Regions:
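Serine-esterase "nucleophile elbow" of acetyl-processing enzymes
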Residues: 1-40, 49
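Alpha-helical cap/lid subdomain in secreted, periplasmic
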Residues: 40-188
Length: 188
Protein backbone atom coordinates (compact mmCIF):
# COMPACT_ATOMS: atom_id res chain seq x y z
CA UNK A 1 0.00 0.00 0.00
CA UNK A 2 0.87 3.64 -0.14
CA UNK A 3 1.32 5.77 2.97
CA UNK A 4 -1.25 8.58 3.01
CA UNK A 5 0.62 10.45 5.73
CA UNK A 6 0.17 10.78 9.46
CA UNK A 7 -2.51 13.47 9.08
CA UNK A 8 -4.96 10.97 7.58
CA UNK A 9 -4.40 8.12 10.04
CA UNK A 10 -7.83 6.87 11.10
CA UNK A 11 -6.97 7.02 14.80
CA UNK A 12 -5.89 10.66 14.49
CA UNK A 13 -9.16 11.52 12.78
CA UNK A 14 -11.02 9.68 15.55
CA UNK A 15 -9.09 11.59 18.24
CA UNK A 16 -9.98 14.88 16.55
CA UNK A 17 -13.64 13.86 16.37
CA UNK A 18 -13.63 12.87 20.07
CA UNK A 19 -11.58 15.97 21.01
CA UNK A 20 -8.96 13.95 22.87
CA UNK A 21 -5.19 13.52 22.89
CA UNK A 22 -3.62 11.49 20.11
CA UNK A 23 -0.41 9.49 20.50
CA UNK A 24 0.78 7.65 17.40
CA UNK A 25 2.73 4.52 18.31
CA UNK A 26 2.40 2.56 15.08
CA UNK A 27 5.09 1.98 12.48
CA UNK A 28 4.66 0.59 8.99
CA UNK A 29 5.89 -3.00 8.86
CA UNK A 30 5.74 -3.56 12.62
CA UNK A 31 5.15 -6.99 14.06
CA UNK A 32 2.39 -7.70 16.54
CA UNK A 33 5.09 -8.34 19.13
CA UNK A 34 6.48 -4.82 18.56
CA UNK A 35 2.99 -3.30 18.90
CA UNK A 36 2.37 -5.13 22.18
CA UNK A 37 5.80 -4.07 23.46
CA UNK A 38 5.11 -0.42 22.59
CA UNK A 39 1.69 -0.52 24.26
CA UNK A 40 3.11 -2.15 27.39
CA UNK A 41 5.96 0.37 27.65
CA UNK A 42 3.62 3.32 27.05
CA UNK A 43 1.28 2.17 29.82
CA UNK A 44 4.13 1.52 32.23
CA UNK A 45 5.57 4.99 31.53
CA UNK A 46 2.31 6.98 31.41
CA UNK A 47 -0.38 5.32 33.48
CA UNK A 48 1.18 6.32 36.81
CA UNK A 49 1.19 10.03 35.92
CA UNK A 50 -2.60 10.26 36.03
CA UNK A 51 -2.62 12.38 32.87
CA UNK A 52 -4.68 9.78 31.05
CA UNK A 53 -7.73 8.55 32.96
CA UNK A 54 -8.77 5.78 30.61
CA UNK A 55 -6.66 5.66 27.45
CA UNK A 56 -8.17 4.13 24.33
CA UNK A 57 -5.89 2.01 22.14
CA UNK A 58 -6.84 1.25 18.53
CA UNK A 59 -4.79 -1.80 17.57
CA UNK A 60 -4.46 -3.04 14.00
CA UNK A 61 -2.87 -6.48 13.97
CA UNK A 62 -0.25 -7.29 11.36
CA UNK A 63 0.83 -10.62 9.89
CA UNK A 64 2.04 -13.40 12.17
CA UNK A 65 5.14 -14.05 10.05
CA UNK A 66 6.58 -10.69 11.10
CA UNK A 67 8.80 -10.73 14.14
CA UNK A 68 10.78 -8.31 16.21
CA UNK A 69 14.49 -8.57 16.86
CA UNK A 70 16.97 -6.46 18.78
CA UNK A 71 20.02 -5.40 16.82
CA UNK A 72 23.08 -6.19 18.90
CA UNK A 73 25.18 -3.41 17.40
CA UNK A 74 22.49 -0.72 17.07
CA UNK A 75 20.96 -1.52 20.47
CA UNK A 76 17.42 -1.02 19.18
CA UNK A 77 14.50 -3.06 17.91
CA UNK A 78 13.56 -3.76 14.31
CA UNK A 79 11.09 -6.07 12.59
CA UNK A 80 11.81 -8.79 10.08
CA UNK A 81 9.30 -9.99 7.50
CA UNK A 82 10.56 -13.35 6.24
CA UNK A 83 7.23 -14.19 4.57
CA UNK A 84 7.95 -11.39 2.10
CA UNK A 85 11.55 -12.31 1.33
CA UNK A 86 10.64 -12.60 -2.37
CA UNK A 87 9.59 -8.91 -2.30
CA UNK A 88 12.94 -7.70 -0.96
CA UNK A 89 15.22 -6.50 -3.72
CA UNK A 90 18.96 -6.61 -3.03
CA UNK A 91 19.05 -2.98 -1.88
CA UNK A 92 16.21 -3.46 0.62
CA UNK A 93 17.72 -6.68 1.93
CA UNK A 94 21.09 -4.91 2.32
CA UNK A 95 19.40 -2.40 4.65
CA UNK A 96 17.97 -5.25 6.72
CA UNK A 97 21.34 -7.02 6.70
CA UNK A 98 23.00 -3.87 8.04
CA UNK A 99 20.52 -3.80 10.94
CA UNK A 100 21.03 -7.50 11.66
CA UNK A 101 24.77 -8.02 11.11
CA UNK A 102 26.28 -4.56 10.54
CA UNK A 103 27.44 -5.99 7.18
CA UNK A 104 29.48 -8.68 8.91
CA UNK A 105 27.67 -11.38 6.95
CA UNK A 106 26.65 -11.70 3.34
CA UNK A 107 23.17 -10.54 2.36
CA UNK A 108 22.60 -13.87 0.61
CA UNK A 109 22.97 -15.63 3.98
CA UNK A 110 20.13 -13.49 5.34
CA UNK A 111 17.99 -14.30 2.30
CA UNK A 112 18.69 -18.02 2.76
CA UNK A 113 17.88 -17.80 6.47
CA UNK A 114 14.55 -16.07 5.80
CA UNK A 115 13.63 -18.61 3.13
CA UNK A 116 14.64 -21.47 5.43
CA UNK A 117 12.58 -20.01 8.29
CA UNK A 118 9.43 -19.63 6.18
CA UNK A 119 9.82 -23.06 4.56
CA UNK A 120 10.74 -25.19 7.57
CA UNK A 121 10.10 -23.36 10.85
CA UNK A 122 7.14 -21.00 10.44
CA UNK A 123 3.78 -22.71 11.04
CA UNK A 124 0.84 -20.38 10.43
CA UNK A 125 -1.60 -22.30 12.64
CA UNK A 126 0.84 -22.33 15.56
CA UNK A 127 1.61 -18.63 15.13
CA UNK A 128 -2.11 -17.83 14.96
CA UNK A 129 -2.59 -19.62 18.31
CA UNK A 130 0.41 -17.77 19.75
CA UNK A 131 -1.11 -14.46 18.63
CA UNK A 132 -4.48 -15.39 20.15
CA UNK A 133 -2.82 -16.12 23.51
CA UNK A 134 -0.94 -12.83 23.36
CA UNK A 135 -4.12 -10.90 22.52
CA UNK A 136 -5.96 -12.50 25.44
CA UNK A 137 -3.10 -11.57 27.80
CA UNK A 138 -3.06 -8.03 26.38
CA UNK A 139 -6.84 -7.85 26.90
CA UNK A 140 -6.49 -8.63 30.61
CA UNK A 141 -3.42 -6.39 31.02
CA UNK A 142 -5.27 -3.43 29.49
CA UNK A 143 -8.36 -4.01 31.63
CA UNK A 144 -6.18 -4.30 34.73
CA UNK A 145 -4.60 -0.93 33.93
CA UNK A 146 -7.91 0.89 33.29
CA UNK A 147 -7.29 1.08 29.54
CA UNK A 148 -9.88 0.61 26.84
CA UNK A 149 -9.05 -0.75 23.40
CA UNK A 150 -10.46 -1.83 20.08
CA UNK A 151 -8.60 -4.37 17.98
CA UNK A 152 -8.94 -5.35 14.33
CA UNK A 153 -7.13 -7.39 11.73
CA UNK A 154 -5.16 -5.10 9.44
CA UNK A 155 -3.54 -7.65 7.13
CA UNK A 156 -4.72 -11.18 7.89
CA UNK A 157 -7.39 -12.77 10.05
CA UNK A 158 -5.51 -14.72 12.71
CA UNK A 159 -7.83 -14.34 15.71
CA UNK A 160 -9.87 -17.51 15.35
CA UNK A 161 -12.60 -17.95 17.95
CA UNK A 162 -11.41 -15.33 20.48
CA UNK A 163 -13.18 -12.40 18.77
CA UNK A 164 -16.22 -12.67 21.06
CA UNK A 165 -13.94 -12.49 24.13
CA UNK A 166 -12.20 -9.22 23.19
CA UNK A 167 -13.09 -5.71 22.00
CA UNK A 168 -12.97 -6.72 18.36
CA UNK A 169 -13.87 -4.51 15.40
CA UNK A 170 -15.27 -6.47 12.47
CA UNK A 171 -15.49 -5.07 8.95
CA UNK A 172 -18.05 -7.65 7.88
CA UNK A 173 -21.67 -6.57 7.60
CA UNK A 174 -24.71 -7.19 5.40
CA UNK A 175 -22.79 -5.98 2.34
CA UNK A 176 -19.20 -7.04 2.95
CA UNK A 177 -18.60 -10.77 3.47
CA UNK A 178 -14.91 -11.02 2.53
CA UNK A 179 -11.92 -11.76 4.77
CA UNK A 180 -12.33 -9.74 7.96
CA UNK A 181 -9.31 -7.48 7.51
CA UNK A 182 -8.91 -3.74 7.05
CA UNK A 183 -6.78 -4.34 3.94
CA UNK A 184 -9.38 -6.51 2.19
CA UNK A 185 -12.25 -4.26 3.29
CA UNK A 186 -10.53 -1.22 1.76
CA UNK A 187 -9.87 -3.13 -1.47
CA UNK A 188 -13.51 -4.28 -1.65
Amino acid sequence: GKCVGLDLVSTKLLAEKLNCDYVHMGNTGSSNERMFKNIYEWIENNNETGHYEKPLFIIGLSGTARWMFRSQHKKKYFDLQPAHVQNYDDEALEKVNEKVTNWRDDVNELRKFMEYYITWIYDIEEHDLKLQRSVMMLHHYLKGNNCDYRIHNSLEDSLGDIKDKINYISFQDDNYKGEDTWKNFLMW
